[in-house]
Amino acid sequence: FWGLSLGLGCWRIRVHRSTTGPQDGERPFAPVIVSNHISYADIPLLMLLELPSIVAKSDTAAIPFIGFYARAWQCVFVDRSGKVPSVDLIRQRQIDINKNKDAGWPRLAIFAEGTTTNGRSLIQFQRGGFMSGLPVQPYVLSYRSYSWFSPAFESMNGLPHLFYTLSTLGFAVDILELPVYVPSEEERANPALYAENVRKAMGTYAKMPLADTNCWDKLALLGRGVHRKVE
């Protein structure tokens, strides 16, 4: 994963760990990793920290090479058409991981925004990753480009974006690890509240604003044929 991260231009990677809250062995176990989502480089970057399973779109399984590894990592594939109860799959995986934590089951990484963004703010979180009411480990990723090109994969078609990513001078990446977030009784009973409070905590620690928009707004925009062009 070091090679893949370097190949995607992540030349400088720094991990910043919060010094507040319980440390190391004192930390409660969190079966879920929650992160913002900026680029496809986010996945190998999280893999450098540990080897979690990933929640991914169902069509990811059909992508050559990537689909093979996604299945090997025991990813949870979600169907946005609603034909498969994705929330139930995610919730059950979290419960199974928590029950088998002593057996070394990989944690489940969720990009809670449900899509990629430009990384300048946190859009509203989807509730699926919070339905189990179990603790989560938040991470906040940020990129800084050494050239004019942004690695954010938010509104450019895939092949042009990959071409410019591989052609750029590279990026510096900062990964902020927050304390494990343990939900209150009220948050466990209300996944929407739990998701929003985790988003607020991530925004506060990362000094990142919260945006009043969600992944469906982005999909609606792209559905109208709005894509970013490289000048």
Label each residue range with its predicted role.
Residues 201-205, 209:
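C-terminal alpha-helix
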Residues 57, 78, 111, 139-141:
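Generic beta-sheet signal
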Residues 6-8, 25-86, 146-147:
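Catalytic core of membrane glycerolipid acyltransferases/transacylases, capturing the structured
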Residues 65-72, 103-107, 114-196, 209-227:
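A cross-family acyltransferase "interaction/gating" segment
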Residues 16-21, 25-26, 39-42, 63, ...:
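Eukaryotic intrinsically disordered and solvent-exposed regulatory patches
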